[in-house]
Structure formats: structure tokens, C-alpha cells
């Protein structure tokens, strides 16, 4: 199946081929793109982090289990949303999965609507996360355009210091502080000190 950057993809990992096929048929019926794998090892052989996506993952898999894989992803800060499927309905296991950020924990075979609802939530979560990451990268790129002195002034403004206080702290005139603050706001495209403070907080 062809996967492009603007398509959301549901990655299905389950060692039961018939069950995988049934999920593909369900998701295809509502226009969702899918890629299927019989094990974590097969999944790792592909690039599954470049598009808006989620994982539908069997808890008990040959080799690395679903929960172990979730823990490994967390260690590498890979935040792809996961929906766990289990034939056992293990409550302690589901609690552990949810604490690590799983979207849902469903008993196999799941109700079609329950699975579709969970996938909708998961894909929106991933889409929102990616948009936030792009915005943060763009903001940090803008901050690179500031001079060291401008970054210093910006940091002090964000801490709530007045121009006079900043001038005293830096050993410069108040007019110089106003100039640097104006340049910072111009470069970052903000119109008020409140917006500047918010932008500083987002970049941290």
C-alpha cells in the first residue's frame, strides 16, 4: 500500500493473520489506510514514524511483547499513540498500559465502534502532537535569529522585570533596553509583552 506524508496510517501488529485481515477490512470500509505486521520485529523493519499514525497492538506477541515495546518506545520518546488488544482482559496489564500513555485497552475481538472511536482519538492525538512539534521547531528557528543580547533581554522581560530593572541588571540605559525589546518583538512577530512572555514559555 502506498503511504504518503499527508495520509494517516493505522499500523496493525498481531500474530493472527485472519484477525489482521478482519481489522483491515473494517478500517478500509471507513477509508482508513492500514499497514499490517505479524510481529514487532516486522514493524521495526519499516519506517512508522514519518506520518500521522497510531498502533493497534496485540499485548501478547512472539518475541517482544506489546507492553515491552510500549516501554521501549517511551524510553526513546517515540510518542506514537497505541491501542492495545488482548484476549485476556488483564486489568493490571491494562492499568500499566494506560499509565504509559496508551489510548485504550480493548478485549479481542473488540466492538467495531469501540475500535473506530479509539483510532479516531489516537490519530487526532498524533496529529495534534505533530502540529505542536512543528510550531515549536518554527519558534526555535525564529529564536536563532536573535542576538545574544536580545535573547538576554527577552528572558528578563519574560521573568516580569521592568525596563528600568533590566537596564540596571545589564548595566545599560533604559533606552537601550527598549530598543532591544522592540527588535525582539519585531523579529518574533509579536505585538505585546504578554505575547512575548507566552512565546518564551512555549519555547522552554
Residue ranges of each PLM-predicted region?
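Short amphipathic alpha-helix used as the core "switch/output" element in two-component signaling
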Residues: 45, 67-79, 96
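Helix-turn-helix DNA-binding segment
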Residues: 137-175
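Basic, Lys/Arg-enriched C-terminal extension of HTH/homeodomain DNA-binding domains
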Residues: 185-204
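C-terminal output helix
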Residues: 90-92, 106, 110-120
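Non-catalytic signal-transmission and effector/linker regions of two-component phosphorelay proteins
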Residues: 1-11, 17, 24, 138, ...
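Acidic, metal-coordinating helix/loop segments flanking the phosphotransfer/catalytic sites
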Residues: 36-54
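Active-site residues of response regulator receiver
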Residues: 58, 86
Amino acid at each position: 500500500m502506498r503511504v504518503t506524508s499527508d495520509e494517516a496510517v493505522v499500523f496493525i501488529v498481531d500474530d493472527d493473520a485472519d484477525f489482521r485481515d478482519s481489522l483491515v477490512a473494517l478500517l478500509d470500509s471507513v477509508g482508513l489506510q492500514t499497514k499490517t505486521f505479524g510481529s514487532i520485529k516486522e514493524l521495526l523493519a519499516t519506517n512508522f514514524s514519518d506520518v500521522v499514525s497510531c498502533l493497534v497492538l496485540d499485548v501478547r506477541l512472539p518475541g517482544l511483547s506489546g507492553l515491552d515495546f510500549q516501554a521501549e518506545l517511551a524510553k526513546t520518546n517515540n510518542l506514537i499513540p497505541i491501542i492495545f488488544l488482548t484476549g485476556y482482559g488483564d486489568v493490571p496489564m491494562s492499568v500499566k498500559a494506560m499509565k504509559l500513555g496508551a489510548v485504550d485497552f480493548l478485549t479481542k475481538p473488540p466492538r467495531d465502534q469501540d475500535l473506530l472511536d479509539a483510532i479516531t482519538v489516537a490519530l487526532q492525538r498524533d496529529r495534534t502532537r505533530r502540529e505542536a512539534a512543528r510550531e515549536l521547531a518554527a519558534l526555535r528557528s525564529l529564536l536563532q535569529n536573535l542576538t545574544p543580547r536580545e535573547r538576554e533581554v527577552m528572558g528578563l522581560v519574560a521573568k516580569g522585570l521592568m525596563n528600568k530593572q533590566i537596564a540596571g541588571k545589564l548595566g545599560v540605559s533604559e533606552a537601550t533596553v527598549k530598543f532591544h525589546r522592540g527588535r525582539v518583538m519585531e523579529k518574533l512577530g509579536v505585538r505585546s509583552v504578554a505575547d512575548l512572555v507566552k512565546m518564551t514559555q512555549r519555547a522552554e
